[in-house]
Amino acid sequence: MPKKINIPEPEENLKFIDVHCHLPFHRPKRDQLPSDKVQYLNYFKLGGQYLITSTIDMQTLNFTLDFMKKFGRNFGFTCGWAPQTVTYTPKEKYDLEWKNWLAFIQNNQDKYLAIGEIGLDFHHAKTLKKRTKQVEVLKQIFELTKDLEKPYILHVRNAAEHEFDRQNPKHRFNKKDGVNKEILNILKEFKIEPQRVMWHCFSGPEEYGRTLPNQGFTLSVPSSAYGFNRWRRVTKFSPLESLVTETDSYYQHPFKRGPLNVPSNVRYSIAAIAFSHNIPQKTVSEKTVENAIKFFKLEIKG
């Protein structure tokens, strides 16, 4: 559990947009969550303006498309091939699913909001071989999609100290910001404008919370920033104009660990930003909704 601090609870009547959740999704083990339908309805009942879910492979893409047949109002999705997908998909399935995923994003551009989540995760990929594979696939994605004029949603996770590749101790991937630097170099290589890129569930390092917004990137603050200072401090000095809010549910609960989060808890992201920036929650609510609408070009139905 996080250390208790005196952060005000989310105020009533806030408007909000969760720009990154995983609803619907296959139910987690030890499932304690309301049904997908109940989570969706509660989200809008409490002030949600639009809900964006992130797919990570063909299975979650198909799951989402099926859900949207019943619950598609003010609900959209991003189409991703996550770094975990690269690392964990069995070889016998990978080539066909990759081919099908590419075909979908190229032939169905009107159905999804952005490409993502995509990126690098050196927690899940711990060897140089696996990390290099993630880099190669990310480059392929940019090469094949850069002309689609879609935004990108990045999954960025640096290796922790205990996750360094001991067989290649001096490799650049082992640095505390190794993933950040690698991704910035790749974006530059493929001439991807920062204004097209959102760093989902931004986790730092702290200096990047200052420099990335100055370059034009958008940073997403998770609901866990409410109860866990390590998530809150990395955007403490980021301008509000560069921030959006997310839950990454069912993980990243505001003050608990485990698969317990729901999209309506994005209100806690608003409360966390208001606390770290010392500004009213209503101001954060209004600006982050505006930022999300602008980034994704959302059309909200009344």
Annotate each predicted stretch with a short phrase.
Residues 1-302:
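Mid-domain alpha/beta scaffold segments of enzyme catalytic cores
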